[in-house]
Every structure is written in C-alpha cells, then in structure tokens.
C-alpha cells in the first residue's frame, strides 16, 4: 500500500504518540509499504499556547494538499486532531480517499484540566473530527467501548509494543540514579498538569523520587519539590538505563489512553504502581497480573491510595514484570494497524462518512 501518515506529533517531541508512530513507520517500511509522513517539520510552526515544547504547524492546508497530491496515497492515517490532522482530513474528504484516524490522547480531559471547563464542551469537536474516518484506531478495547458510547462505534484495535532490543533488564545503572540512596521511585513522561505528578511527589514513602521528562510544569515542580531529582528528558539507552536503575515505576496519570512508558518500564523489570483507571487497568488488569490475569505473579499494584500502591509494588518480582513487559511486541501491533488500513481501503464508507459536511 501507499500509506500517508499525517501527524502534528513528531520529533523532536518526546511522547508515546511519537514513539508509537516511529516504530510503526519502521515496521511498515520493512513490510514493503511506501510510507509518506506529513509532520510539523515541513511547515513554519508556532509554540502551542501554554505548552511551548509542542510546536504547531502554521496554515498547513496548502502544503498538506501539495504533499498528498504528489504522493497519491491509497489510504491516509491521520494520527492527531491538530492543524495537520484537520488539513489531511479535508483533503481526503475532497478527493474521496479513505482515511483512518487515531484516538491517542484524551484532549477533552486535558482541555478541561487546563481551562476549568467541562470535558463535555470539547467532545463535539472530537466527534466531528473522527466521525467520517473509516476506522478510529484505539489502544484498548475499553477505550473503543467508551468512544462507541459517545457516538463513535467504528473503532479498531491498534495495541502498543516495546522495542525489545532496547527495553530489557540488565542495562548498567544510570550514574545519576545509581548514586542515590534507595529505594528509587521513577516517573517518566511529560511534566505537565494533566499527568497529575503532585499525587506521586506528595506520597510519604521512604526513598528517592526521580522524574525523567520535560514539560511546562518542570520549573515550578523543581522549585516546589527540592528533594526530588529531575533529570530532564532521556532517550534511547539512557532511558532504558533509567528504568533499570529504579525499584518502582510510578504512573500517577488518570487521563492517559494507554501509557507506553508503563510497558517500557515493565519490560526493563520494573514493577508498576498506578491508579485503577483506564490505561493502567488495560495493561495490568484489575489484579495487577496482566490482561485476563495471564501472569502467575503480580507485576503491578493498582490502588486509589497511591502510597499503598507504591509500597505494594516495591515487594513485587522484577523478573515477572520483565516477562510480561516483553509480551507487548510491535509486530502484533503493526499487524493490527496494517489490517485496519487494508479494511479501510476496501470497505464501503459508513453512513456518517457519506453525509456531506456543512461549511
């Protein structure tokens, strides 16, 4: 297939969306597909309001059209609901080219956290964006069911994986963490209000808390929590070494659709502590023994009392965590992605996709 992928999230951004797309593009190319990326790198950009680390393409409509016309894709995957995503969507509808979308991020919830408005205020925009796609790709069945309840029933599963060549036990400890007195509790991800970091940083546990990542709240949290080690963003082997240097991975977010860092941490032999909410529940299962209690040993602790979850996770077997984390492979995830796009290419559009949009 000739596959175009339009995304507002791409390097140098550091997040699960970018890592998921990068691994998928690599896998698709290895399978012989022709892949064209449309990313903010191709446009003039401006900082996202309130989040200068993320840059949004300025007026990408015409550049997106030119790129898609030149590439002539069989099918388009639109990964994000930003300016590039909307531009690619408009091109597909105008040309009659089938497209899929992805629901990576709970933008209504994030917007609610940042604005104080109800998340329901933002859902009509999400429904409009996704309604005409041939399929909405989601990381978990639970998320698909949630979208169906909101009037978007045409979802397909696109799970996530880990790069097993990178994320595995046995890496040498990261010097910045190895020098700390243990136990070490680690968070990896954006340092932003929607990640609920104070819930972790305020926990009264003995040991040292380490935060890996960048974001708009970094300076404020560094000042507010002087005893916490903030290491900034880490990549590649340095990130894997950070996982291997800790005793517990703490994931305080209540709004993630999945949590790629959770399975990376597990694959490195790091038990997980989190809230029993979508994302962690979909990875760890209600009992912390994996999806459908597939593991004989517990690999994570889910509890509304995050302090209790951390203390329980500290007692878990790192080897069991590593075995379970390694079960998440990109090969299977890319099979699902590829199947969804093939089905989109050959399927008849849904009734909502055939309905003309009002200007």
Predicted features by range, described:
Residues 124-172:
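Donor nucleotide-sugar binding/catalytic pocket of nucleotide-sugar-dependent glycosyltransferases
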Residues 219-238:
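Nucleotide-activated donor-binding/catalytic signature segment of Leloir-type glycosyltransferases, i.e.
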Residues 311-349:
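A charged, aromatic-enriched C-terminal amphipathic alpha-helix characteristic of glycosyltransferases
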């Amino acid at each position: 297939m000739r596959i175009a992928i339009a995304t507002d999230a791409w390097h140098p951004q550091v997040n699960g969306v970018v890592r998921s797309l990068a691994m998928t593009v690599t896998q698709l190319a290895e399978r012989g597909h022709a892949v064209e990326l449309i990313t903010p790198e191709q446009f003039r950009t401006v900082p996202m309001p309130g989040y200068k680390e993320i840059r949004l393409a300025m007026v990408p409509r015409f550049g997106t059209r030119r790129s898609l016309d030149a590439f002539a894709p069989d099918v388009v995957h639109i990964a994000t609901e930003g300016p590039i995503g909307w531009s690619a969507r408009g091109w597909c509808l105008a040309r009659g080219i089938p497209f899929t979308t992805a629901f990576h991020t709970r933008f209504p919830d994030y917007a609610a956290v940042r604005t104080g408005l109800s998340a329901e205020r933002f859902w009509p925009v999400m429904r409009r964006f996704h309604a005409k796609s041939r399929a909405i790709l989601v990381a978990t069945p639970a998320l698909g069911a949630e979208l169906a309840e909101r009037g978007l029933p045409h979802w397909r599963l696109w799970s996530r994986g880990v790069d097993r060549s990178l994320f595995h036990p046995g890496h040498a400890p990261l010097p910045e963490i190895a020098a700390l007195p243990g136990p070490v509790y680690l968070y990896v991800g954006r340092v932003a209000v929607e990640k609920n970091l104070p819930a972790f940083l305020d926990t009264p546990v003995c040991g040292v808390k380490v935060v890996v990542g960048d974001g708009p709240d970094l300076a404020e949290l560094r000042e507010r929590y002087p005893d916490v080690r903030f290491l900034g963003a880490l990549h590649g082997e340095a990130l894997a070494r950070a996982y291997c240097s800790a005793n517990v991975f703490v994931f305080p977010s209540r709004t993630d659709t999945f949590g790629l860092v959770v399975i990376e941490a597990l694959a490195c032999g790091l038990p997980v502590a989190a809230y029993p909410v979508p994302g962690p529940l979909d990875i760890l299962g209600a009992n912390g023994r994996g999806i459908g209690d597939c593991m004989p040993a517990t690999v994570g602790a889910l509890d509304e009392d995050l302090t209790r979850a951390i203390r329980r996770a500290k007692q878990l077997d790192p080897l069991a965590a590593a075995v379970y984390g390694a079960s998440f492979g990109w090969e299977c995830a890319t099979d699902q992605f590829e199947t969804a796009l093939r089905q989109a290419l050959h399927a008849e559009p849904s009734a909502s996709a055939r309905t003309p949009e009002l200007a």
